[in-house]
Amino acid sequence: MSSNNNTNTAPANANSSHHHHHHHHHHHHHGHGGSNSTLNNPKSSLADGAHIGNYQIVKTLGEGSFGKVKLAYHTTTGQKVALKIINKKVLAKSDMQGRIEREISYLRLLRHPHIIKLYDVIKSKDEIIMVIEYAGNELFDYIVQRDKMSEQEARRFFQQIISAVEYCHRHKIVHRDLKPENLLLDEHLNVKIADFGLSNIMTDGNFLKTSCGSPNYAAPEVISGKLYAGPEVDVWSCGVILYVMLCRRLPFDDESIPVLFKNISNGVYTLPKFLSPGAAGLIKRMLIVNPLNRISIHEIMQDDWFKVDLPEYLLPPDLKPHPEEENENNDSKKDGSSPDNDEIDDNLVNILSSTMGYEKDEIYESLESSEDTPAFNEIRDAYMLIKENKSLIKDMKANKSVSDELDTFLSQSPPTFQQQSKSHQKSQVDHETAKQHARRMASAITQQRTYHQSPFMDQYKEEDSTVSILPTSLPQIHRANMLAQGSPAASKISPLVTKKSKTRWHFGIRSRSYPLDVMGEIYIALKNLGAEWAKPSEEDLWTIKLRWKYDIGNKTNTNEKIPDLMKMVIQLFQIETNNYLVDFKFDGWESSYGDDTTVSNISEDEMSTFSAYPFLHLTTKLIMELAVNSQSN
């Protein structure tokens, strides 16, 4: 391909600087391409020139939310890799250490042509070092250096991105932080997505603490600090990315973070006239504020604009055309479902035991058993994942344009030196790019500082709930959110619970009814019980703010007016596909006597002690009322 002269040596650098600040108000974490060696700490055992395992470090590429990213090469093959060094301090509490290491091993099984591969994991006392595929460029630098990107070219990138995201969602992994720095390009101009699966291992799964100050790509439910963010958040980010490729600017961009947040929360953006109706229509369906109404990845793959010139290897198994349909009918049921009605493939068992460290007889046992234990399910998942990799490879072989890249895709370990000769010439990043990179870093860092101190964020602080309302983000548990697209077998799978971890409780009541029906039921119950509520705003359809008179009974001292209107907030969350949670929250008191002065002189402690019983009492009444109604229906 003529573009082998690498997008880093851009003569277009002169004009790229004025676009750049648009896409990169964020902490630039590793288009594994920047040359930013100032971050090095010479005393560290990870200094330039140091050896880790079979790798020798060349330089630091950048620093991300998880720690430094270094360029290194394999001492015998000369193969370039990137090392992502995760300091164990940033990881969730120490009792999660085992889970995190399992989770990172699970990521080693992900094999998709458009995902950065994880070759190996090296553990030390303080760090986990991920050895990952090296890709020299960022998609967005490439966009900026082009005068304009045709819809055709943008669609090719977009198809690759969506296919990779679909693949991960199918394997219960949500990215949650898709943004330009995570979209890299290899020398064939193929997209490679970095950091899939990593948002799960950050402390408390709190996105805002860990995201690098790039709210421009974050979905409304992420910036509002909602407790649950499922596959829908990736759809939103992909919508923003498609918009940027086609329009060369961000749909949501404002110097003021509060204004930016407001625009994102209300979905306020403009579509330029020059977009084709197909592209504009797709963007509109992706940037829908309410995640329940947003298009799904699966639906995107069936969109007409998306399907133009779509290479078949990008399709998931259930969307692939089957030429030999007739005789496949009886097999097709097995295809995506459980491995037990199929011959067990010994090769797969070997791969599984070497990558994940399971005992072989443990693997055979779990594949032959129909028992539904978390440990067995985890092994079955992993087996199915590898099995599917095999069929993906078959598809890729059939696709001429892709088959020459098969070698790198297949390799469990990095490819050999010969394949690398071309890219060695690229590592000389010219001086101008480096200077620009430094400038961009500087602006990203100041940008980030203002973002974290913005007073607007303060109003979210007290809403930070320590209650975990929603399931943990283990990749295995994300299956729950994926069931809609999943195989019939998926519904048998129960989340993995490690012995140490405590049971996660759901607070509130769960429902499988349609969300609008649930809300309707709640309003009927509230009306029957004589509560009042504020009219909900368009974006708060799923939240009810209400007042409810609570009769305190024996008023000994009539002068002392005890506030008697309890305020509550009821909110509907989506826990997983077709499974919702109604959450009740105490929200203070008002007085029906019309003067709120009395409320303020009760101390907060007194207030909460005094409120616990009334709150539970009213909540119970409401739940009973809902139960009665649902039976009478």
From Swiss-Prot:
The modification Phosphothreonine is found at T210. Changing L367I: Alters kinase activation and biological activity, including enhanced allosteric subunit associations and increased oxidative stress resistance and life span. There is a cross-link at K461 (Glycyl lysine isopeptide (Lys-Gly) (interchain with G-Cter in ubiquitin)). One of its GO terms (cellular component) is nuclear membrane. There is a cross-link at K549 (Glycyl lysine isopeptide (Lys-Gly) (interchain with G-Cter in SUMO)). Phosphorylation at Thr-210 in response to glucose limitation leads to activation of kinase activity. ADP, but not AMP, protects the enzyme from dephosphorylation at Thr-210 by GLC7. Sumoylation by the SUMO (E3) ligase MMS21 leads to inhibition by interaction of SUMO attached to Lys-549 with a SUMO-interacting sequence motif located near the active site of SNF1, and by targeting SNF1 for glucose-induced destruction via the SLX5-SLX8 (SUMO-directed) ubiquitin ligase. Residues 1-46, 317-345, 409-434 are annotated as: Disordered. It is a peripheral membrane protein. Belongs to the protein kinase superfamily. CAMK Ser/Thr protein kinase family. SNF1 subfamily. Serine/threonine protein kinase essential for release from glucose repression. Catalytic subunit of the AMP-activated protein kinase complex also known as the SNF1 kinase complex (Snf1c), a central regulator of cellular energy homeostasis, which, in response to a fall in intracellular ATP levels, activates energy-producing pathways and inhibits energy-consuming processes. The complex phosphorylates histone H3 to form H3S10ph, which promotes H3K14ac formation, leading to transcriptional activation through TBP recruitment to the promoters. PANTHER family: MAP/MICROTUBULE AFFINITY-REGULATING KINASE, NON-SPECIFIC SERINE_THREONINE PROTEIN KINASE. Component of the AMP-activated protein kinase complex also known as the SNF1 kinase complex (Snf1c), a heterotrimeric complex composed of an alpha subunit (SNF1), a regulatory subunit beta (GAL83 and substoichiometric alternate beta subunits SIP1 and SIP2), and a regulatory subunit gamma (SNF4). Interacts with the transcriptional activator SIP4. Interacts with SAK1. Interacts with CTK1: Interacts with adenylate cyclase CYR1. This is Carbon catabolite-derepressing protein kinase. The lineage of its organism: Eukaryota, Fungi, Dikarya, Ascomycota, Saccharomycotina.
